[in-house]
Structures are given as C-alpha cells and as structure tokens.
C-alpha cells in the first residue's frame, strides 16, 4: 500500500468538499505557469487572419511561451492571476468535485451501482453549479494572465482593483462575462474528467490490475486529463477569448466562435492544445492524488480523535 490507508468509514460530504478545494489549490500552485502559457497561446492572433497570425506569432509552443514570458516580463509573469486562481479553485473545485459523489448518490437514490448516465448527469450538474458560484474569479484570473497583450500599461494592478474596475466599467455583467461558454465548458469538463476518472479507476480495481492506492490514482487521473483536453479544448478557447475580450468586441460567445472560424479556421479551436494537455494532465494527477490522500488523512485524523483512550 502506497500513501494513506483507506479507512473503513467513507469520507463525509464536508471532508470531500474541503479536500477537493484544498487539493485543487495545491494543483494550481504547481501547474499555474502551464495554464498561463495556455491562455497566451489561445488569445494569440485573435485579431488577425491565420497567415498574419502565423507570421507575427510572439509565442511558439509551451516551452517557447514560458521562456519568452520570463525573458520579456520576468518569472513573476507566469503566476499573474494566481490569487484569483486560488480563489477560483477554493470555491469552484469544492463544488464541482467535492459535491460530485453526493449528487451522484442523489441521482441513483443512494445505490452504490451508478451507471454512466447518472455519472454524466452528476458531472454536468456540479460543473454548471460551480460556474454559478465562481465565474467572477475566473474572469479576473484570465484577464491577469492575458494582460501583457493589452499594451504597454498593465490592465489591472491588483486582484481587488480588477474586481472593482470590471464592475465599474462593464457593470455586474462584466464579472459574469462568458458564463454561457463556461457553463458549457465545465459541464463537458466535469463529465469528461470525473466520469473518466471514475470509470478508469473502477475498471482497474474490478480487473484487479491495481489496488486502490497512488499508482491507480495516478493512472486514472492522467487518462482523465487526456480525454478531457481532447473533448473540452474548443469550448475552452472560446471561453478564454470571450472573457478576455474588450467591451463590444464580440456580441456573444457564439459570435466569438464564428469569428474564430472565419478568420483563423477550425484549427483555432485547438490553439494551446499541448499546454492545455500538459496543464490538465499534470493538474489532474496532482489534484486527484492529493484529494484521495487528503480524504484518507482527514478521516484517519477524525477516527483517531473519536477513538476511546
């Protein structure tokens, strides 16, 4: 057995809720530079045609993007928007991941045998609900990560200022910009991520290929990360472009997607795929492994507290 041993008592909803948020924050701390590189690649060339964009591309590849940012903006630029990112994960992952099992049990009426339909429904529900809670933090995070593209001056100087400026200049709706594509994205991401993780893990355990410990969690998380990136990349690119856009640049998320297709072609929807996969794959591994261990550690601590002397 590698890591904390599974406890006889299943983790409570509170343990899952807090564990998911904490694990997601740890994963974000480790993988945030990859997410920033992904955002820069996704918004690159959005106001140019495909030929002009290719000729004038500032960022080329994951490593090239990171090195260019470090050289031109300094190492701290890789973590621009981290505060909003951690705020987002604590509120976002707690809901979409921490409540997944509870919602799944609700849809199956407490049965331990959940079909794919129930899992997909639970993933869609918690993914959409999480967006409703955390959308403003996502808007601020994306804008901080992208703001070097906005010109010589920085768009926002601090996280608090960003919230205030967006609310003042764009109204309440500005903080919820991109909610529609984000709901779609996170319903898809949650289904792909959590359901794939669930299914891979169940298959490995039922086939006795692995035991319920770190190697199993690592393999399941990595597979889930790849599947999620393939499925969710097009919606993710539209979400990033739309949330980062200036007031009036796009009339809707659909208009943003149509403009991308007309100006840059279908390949634009997979811009930043490699950093997306590297980020989501590594994020999934760190998050799920940490989450599984946190659940066990918290339940073990609770059991030791309640044990008689």
UniProtKB/Swiss-Prot annotation:
Record carries keyword DNA repair: no
Keywords carried by this UniProt record: Membrane, Mitochondrion, Mitochondrion inner membrane, Repeat, Transmembrane, Transmembrane helix, Transport
Mitochondrial intermembrane side: 1-16, 104-119, 200-217, 295-309
Recorded topology in the membrane: Multi-pass membrane protein
Mitochondrial matrix-side segments: 41-77, 146-173, 243-268
Gene3D superfamilies the UniProt entry points to: Mitochondrial carrier domain
Keyword Membrane appears in the UniProt entry: yes
One GO BP: regulation of mitochondrial membrane potential
UniProt-listed InterPro entries: Mit_carrier, Mito_Metabolite_Transporter, Mitochondrial_sb/sol_carrier, Mt_carrier_dom_sf
GO annotations of cellular component type: mitochondrial inner membrane
GO molecular function: antiporter activity; chloride transmembrane transporter activity; GDP binding; L-aspartate transmembrane transporter activity; malate transmembrane transporter activity; oxaloacetate transmembrane transporter activity; oxidative phosphorylation uncoupler activity; phosphate ion uniporter activity
Site description Important for inhibition by GDP, residues in chain: 141, 185
Family as reported in the entry's similarity comment: Belongs to the mitochondrial carrier (TC 2.A.29) family.
Name this protein carries in UniProt: Dicarboxylate carrier UCP2
Biological source species: Bos taurus (Bovine)
């Amino acid at each position: 057995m590698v890591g904390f041993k599974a406890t006889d008592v299943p983790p409570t909803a509170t343990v899952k809720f807090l564990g998911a948020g904490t694990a997601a924050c740890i994963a974000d701390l480790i993988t945030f530079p990859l997410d920033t590189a992904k955002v820069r690649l996704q918004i690159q060339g959005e106001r140019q045609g495909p030929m002009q964009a290719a000729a004038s591309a500032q960022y080329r590849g994951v490593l090239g993007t990171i090195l260019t940012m470090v050289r031109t903006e300094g190492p701290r630029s890789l973590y621009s928007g981290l505060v909003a990112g951690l705020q987002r994960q604590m509120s976002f992952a707690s809901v979409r991941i921490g409540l997944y099992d509870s919602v799944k049990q609700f849809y199956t009426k407490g049965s331990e045998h959940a079909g794919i339909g129930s899992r997909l429904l639970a993933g869609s529900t918690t993914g959409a609900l999480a967006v409703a809670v955390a959308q403003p933090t996502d808007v601020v995070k994306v804008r901080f990560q992208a703001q070097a593209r906005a010109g010589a001056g920085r768009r926002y100087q601090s996280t608090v200022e960003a919230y205030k400026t967006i609310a003042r200049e764009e109204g309440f709706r500005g903080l919820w910009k991109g909610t529609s594509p984000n709901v779609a994205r996170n319903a898809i991401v949650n289904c792909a991520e959590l359901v794939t993780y669930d299914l891979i893990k169940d298959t490995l355990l039922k086939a006795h290929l692995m035991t319920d410990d770190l190697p199993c969690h690592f393999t399941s998380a990595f597979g889930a990360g790849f599947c999620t990136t393939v499925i969710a990349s097009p919606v993710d690119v539209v979400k990033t472009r739309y949330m980062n856009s200036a007031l009036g640049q796009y009339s809707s998320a659909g208009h943003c997607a149509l403009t991308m297709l007309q100006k840059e072609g279908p390949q634009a929807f997979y811009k930043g795929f490699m950093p997306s996969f590297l980020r989501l794959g590594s994020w999934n591994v760190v998050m799920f492994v940490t989450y599984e261990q946190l659940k066990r550690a918290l339940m073990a601590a609770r059991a030791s507290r309640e044990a008689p002397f």
